Amino acid sequence: MKMSKQSMRRNLLWLSVLAGLTIPSMQAFDLSLHAQADSVQEDVHPMDTSRFLPWSLTMWGQHRSNTMDHQLGQLLVRGGNIDRTLVDAARAAQGGDMGVFGFSSGFQLHARSRRMWKETNWRLCGSIQARWIGDSRWTPELYDLVLTGNAEHLGRWDVLDGTRARSTAWLNAAIGIEGQHHNRVELGLVYRPFQFEGLIHTGYFYVNEAVDDLHASMRANARMSRKAGWGLGVNAEWHFLREEAPFAFHVQLRNLGVVLAPNPLRFAVDTVLETSGLPLSGAGWSIASLQDEGFAEGLYTADSSGVDFQLLPGRLDLSFEYPLSPRTGWDVQVQLGEWMPLPRAISGFRRAFGKHWQAGVQVIAGGWGRVRPAAWARWRMPNERAFMIYIEDPWGWGSDSAYGRGVTLRYESL
């Protein structure tokens, strides 16, 4: 089934508006910020005396690549003259590995009731979160074909396997129960306005040195939502905190769920093209037939029947904290999922300064980028409020040659 021009314009307009609203903050590092502070807080449980429920608000944005620096990525997104040195530098950084780029941005509001449920150790809790994430990967050969051409590839096979691009956004409103140590489980209603994804399963491209023989083959598929989808998602946390144990352990499961997508537009390509030359005109393949309207429609199939069940890009976080002294500690965290090509590993040192300030430094590896530093600071206000800022790759904020930027802000009532 073909998509009408009017429908395609609406989809493009929607994506443009959403990108314009979110790209300035672009991807994110939504880690368990409250967990980093637990091990060095005093053993007291202050009560919020305001009329509002205990709550926290977290906002984040981050983008990261292992090959493209901020300057080249900005030119590719916004347009402009691209200097060849930027292209060559990104190609040298990629080497023979897959190039990757990812982003994540959004916010999460979490609240819980003051009183326990009917004289139990459980209380009601809930959250509202909005997220937008994206993931793209490409082979070195595809990078060359797109940005520099195939002049240096004549006589060799270019491999495109594993190249992909995908993006999605969703809103999750959840309600659940929370027990001791903030252990909780929530079930949420998910609204997903859009998702698109494309993947080249196998792809090859070859032109001989005499430039008179071409071979191209591709098996790929793509899918784009035409209507908003609805589904269910589960969030859960478990925190091991014991006075007799010299350490703390945290497990967080986020956005484990499924979405029902009605009538998505699906494309499939399974084509092999071989030629040793094309006539100007005539029956079959010719230069004239390549220019005819609708020629490309014979290379793929499309349909939009039925519904699809699609998994949300959930994430699992495992955190370990070990106090080195009453005011210092060592943290280790591993994050899995959320379309990251590699697990993200984090290790850091934290210290408390007086009763109201904490700060820490970290080293991050994996995810969408190479090894990079991070730093955070937390201010516990006298009125039982706290504010925290987390910056990934802080030196990258002042340099166009950085491979990404990220910031997370959190405000909470204690």
Spans of model-derived segments:
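Outer-membrane beta-barrel architecture
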Residues: 108-114, 174-178, 235-239, 319-321, ...
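Cleavable N-terminal export/targeting peptides
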Residues: 1-48, 414
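Transmembrane beta-strand segments that form the barrel wall of outer-membrane beta-barrel proteins
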Residues: 327-339, 345-369, 373-377, 385-397
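Detector for outer-membrane/organellar transmembrane beta-barrel domains
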Residues: 235-241, 250-254, 260, 283-358
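A subset of solvent-exposed loop/turn segments in beta-rich extracellular surface proteins, enriched
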Residues: 29-228, 244, 266-290, 389-391, ...
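Extended, H/D-rich, highly charged conserved domains that either
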Residues: 229-233, 261-263
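Membrane-embedded beta-strand positions of outer-membrane beta-barrel proteins
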Residues: 57-59, 124-128, 183-189, 249-251, ...
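Outer-membrane beta-barrel channels and translocator barrels
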Residues: 114-120, 180-182, 241-245, 323-327, ...
